[in-house]
Amino acid sequence: MVIQKNWQELIKPNKLEVAPGHDPKRIATVVAEPLERGFGTTLGNALRRVLLSSLQGAAVTSVHIDGVLHEFSSIPGVREDVTDIVLNIKTIAIRSSSDTPKRMTLRKTGPGLVTAGDISTIGDIQILNPDLVLCTLDEGAEIRMEFTVATGKGYVPADRNRPEDAPIGLIPVDALFSPVTKVSYRIENTREGQDLDKDKLTMTVETNGAVSPEDALAYAARIIQDQLQIFVNFEEPRKEEAAPLAPQLPFNPALLKKVDELELSVRSANCLKNDNIVYIGDLIQKTEAEMLRTPNFGRKSLNEIKEVLAAMGLHLGMDVPGWPPENIEDLAKRFEEHY
């Protein structure tokens, strides 16, 4: 069907290369080619948007700091104010597969730096950037914090992370759940055979370590695939099961093909039709002399037919045992998919 050519005849990328960055668990460059012209931008932009906004991840959604009533406070013996501490907390990279909120705790006495690695976790929660500095304690200072970790996608502002029954002193935190931190892409020309007008898509993906760049890209592609499925309101054409082959057919099934399917010139086709030559099996049993005796059939038509038959491994003057078979029309239909 002509309509199927809309997608079946488009070039599909058949080459995918992954080049790890200086931190292979977090950075990678992926190259896909060849793509139809314009498809590099179409796919690159769609993948980038989904990577940054739609992948599930974990983040701190709220924090409670002992002795602190609100975000605009300061803590004795802590050099940073609470606002700065909360900003640092936002950047904690977390891996968690739990669907329910989890708790983390921190207790540290100065002097010294307080880092994400000082946080005590439970279950499957893992801190991916333990060297992240949260605050600095002076001699004798102490800080205690309790964090709530949840999973989600995209960016959720702090006001949406405040529970209705939030206790006094609970500070909601802006949550950036996406494990992907940066995505860029570029489009270059590439070759497909003799065609130089195709796209090469190069994407560089950086994550926080909760997911590999390759997996993140695969998840994004799957999301796009699933979202587009509803628009595919037709099914792929179903191939009917081929009828079983005759077990002892004494000739090549290609001989059951009709001569009007050989794409001959009008003159040659009409000559065969006037001579009641219907199938290739009828044609190849004719000799050159017999064909030249056909009205209006000349040397040019003869050469044309010889070339077509030669391309099929056949020639005029062949002996075909068992031709014509009984029920030739039924046999021709049964063997249609085999020639």
Curated annotation (Swiss-Prot):
EC number in record: 2.7.7.6
A single GO molecular function term of this UniProt record: DNA-directed RNA polymerase activity
Matches recorded under CDD domains: RNAP_alpha_NTD (cd06928)
Chain intervals for the UniProt region annotation (Alpha C-terminal domain (alpha-CTD)): 251-339
Reactions the enzyme catalyzes: RNA(n) + a ribonucleoside 5'-triphosphate = RNA(n+1) + diphosphate
GO CC entries: cytoplasm; DNA-directed RNA polymerase complex
Chain positions covered by the region annotation Alpha N-terminal domain (alpha-NTD): 1-235
Gene Ontology BP terms: DNA-templated transcription
Annotated keywords: DNA-directed RNA polymerase, Nucleotidyltransferase, Transcription, Transferase
Manganese as UniProt keyword: no
Enzyme class: transferase
One Pfam family this sequence matches: RNA_pol_A_bac
Domain comment, as recorded: The N-terminal domain is essential for RNAP assembly and basal transcription, whereas the C-terminal domain is involved in interaction with transcriptional regulators and with upstream promoter elements.
Subunit structure: Homodimer. The RNAP catalytic core consists of 2 alpha, 1 beta, 1 beta' and 1 omega subunit. When a sigma factor is associated with the core the holoenzyme is formed, which can initiate transcription.
Function: DNA-dependent RNA polymerase catalyzes the transcription of DNA into RNA using the four ribonucleoside triphosphates as substrates.
Family: Belongs to the RNA polymerase alpha chain family.
Name of the featured protein: DNA-directed RNA polymerase subunit alpha
Organism (species): Methylobacterium nodulans (strain LMG 21967 / CNCM I-2342 / ORS 2060)
Designated gene of the protein: rpoA
